[in-house]
Amino acid sequence: MMTASLAGCIGQEEEEEASDWLFIGDSDIEGWDTAQFMNSTNIGDGGSMCSDTLSTIDEVLEEYNPIHVVIVCGENDLSEERTVEETFEDFQAIINKIIESGALVTYMGTKPEPETTELHAQYRDYDSSIQDFAINLATDSSAPLNVVDVYQGFEDIGNPDSLYQEDQLHLSLEGYDYWDQWLVQVSNDSECIIWQSQQCRITIE
């Protein structure tokens, strides 16, 4: 797995192709200042669903040829009354296409947003399906998909309102600070499959 540290992502004299990060998905990606990741491209689109990402992923991969893709999608699908199974099916198809292109993938999981408590059970079921998928994809030597368990990570620190904007839905700067830390940490652990808070919860066996 490609490794990265925040220091290593800033100012290193490396070829662009060797440090190419692509951030795709919904408003959580769109609102994330990802410039600290060297040669990164952020094409997040507010309101985007997994079904939207799937419809464009072939063209996106051809255009950007990323080394590492960071994806957020699913919450909007579930809020539009798509089922967990339908949403996961689209997610799985996206990930398979990314892996086939040769890129690694990190999924930033759903959030325990105060505004969407009626969806939280579905969020957890969805994330559980993705975590199982990531475990099944892993081999003895690599984890092509790793998952940051954002939901449980936020719960571990009490899920304070300060993690969110006033709408209690979108992330605040404090919330994104945790995302920055967790993405750097999981990217630096080549054997990690599931990351939670400050440690790897499931690794390659």
What are these regions (language model features)?
Residues 1-16:
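Secretory targeting signatures
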Residues 62-65, 101, 190:
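Glycine-rich phosphate-binding loop signature in dinucleotide/nucleotide-binding domains
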Residues 16-93, 114-116, 121:
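Conserved SGNH/GDSL esterase-like catalytic core that processes O-acyl groups on lipids
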Residues 111:
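Carbohydrate-associated surface elements
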Residues 114-205:
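Catalytic His-Asp segment of secreted/periplasmic serine-dependent ester chemistry enzymes
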